Design a protein with these regions (language model features):
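Low-complexity, glycine- and small/polar-enriched segments
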Residues: 1-256
């Protein structure tokens, strides 16, 4: 499975929102491969292979020399849920049974936010809060291989492989210009990802050669390369409206 969600604000773009502005790339993937063989006879040798491969990217790219204005601005790239499974099962009953099962999951996921350079009079301006997030909150990969054999003399082999790679990254150029009263920059991935392998060889064989092999690799990369120029805006201007009777009708950012 190759799945890519990209939102791109082009070079020189100008966007103004009266209230909130959200720019986001979101991806969710659920994939399952299942191989199952049941066999029998005098001499029987079922083989099963189940392979699941994921390449998933959520990418928010703000290109050079853009102007964006809003009350609150959110820029987000997120893989909201990654769920990948591979299940291989071989079952055989024979005088001379030979069963082999191999399952393999390979998951490569990316959540990327990139902010390019801007001219001196360009900026991303949020009057309230500017939020920049790259996130992968729910990562799950499961690989299961079973070779079940019944007979007199035989061989059982179960191999389960599971590789989970995730990269969660925010990059802001040294000439990226931001202005806001509150700034949140977060690159976050699942701190307790599910990554399981299971290889089993159940059954009964009087003379048996069994192989059970489980291989697991987890690589998580969270990174923020943030060199942007940030201007923190001052307190909002007070707004007071008093009617002809001397009564306060509106009071914003001020106390009496």
């Amino acid at each position: 499975v190759d799945d890519r969600s990209t939102v791109q604000v082009g070079v020189g773009a100008s966007i103004t929102a009266g209230n909130n502005l959200v720019i986001e790339a979101l991806v969710a993937v659920n994939v399952d491969s299942d191989a199952n063989v049941i066999n029998g006879g005098l001499v029987a040798s079922p083989n099963t292979d189940a392979t699941t491969t994921l390449n998933v990217t959520a990418n928010a790219n703000l290109m050079s020399n853009i102007n964006m204005r809003g009350e609150n601005i959110t820029i987000r790239a997120e893989n909201t849920k990654i769920d990948a499974k591979a299940t291989a099962n071989s079952t055989v009953g024979a005088a001379v049974p030979i069963a082999r099962s191999e399952s393999k999951v390979t998951s490569n996921t990316f959540a990327l936010v990139t902010l390019d350079a801007m001219e001196a009079d360009d900026a991303i301006t949020a009057q309230g809060t500017l939020t920049i997030i790259a996130k992968q909150a729910d990562l799950s990969t499961i690989s299961t291989a079973d070779a079940e054999v019944y007979g007199f003399a035989g061989t059982k082999s179960a191999i389960a492989n599971n590789t989970q790679n995730s990269t969660t990254k925010i990059t802001a150029d040294a000439q990226t210009r931001l202005a806001t009263r509150s700034l949140l920059v977060e690159a976050n991935s699942d701190y307790l990802p599910i990554i399981n392998t299971s290889a089993s060889t159940p059954g009964f064989v009087l003379i048996s050669d069994d192989t059970q092999d489980e291989n697991l690799t987890l690589d998580q990369n969270r990174e923020i390369d943030f060199f942007a120029k940030v201007t923190l805006l001052g307190a909002r201007s007070p707004e007071i409206v008093i009617n002809e009777h001397g009564l306060v009708e509106k009071l914003v950012n001020a106390t009496l």
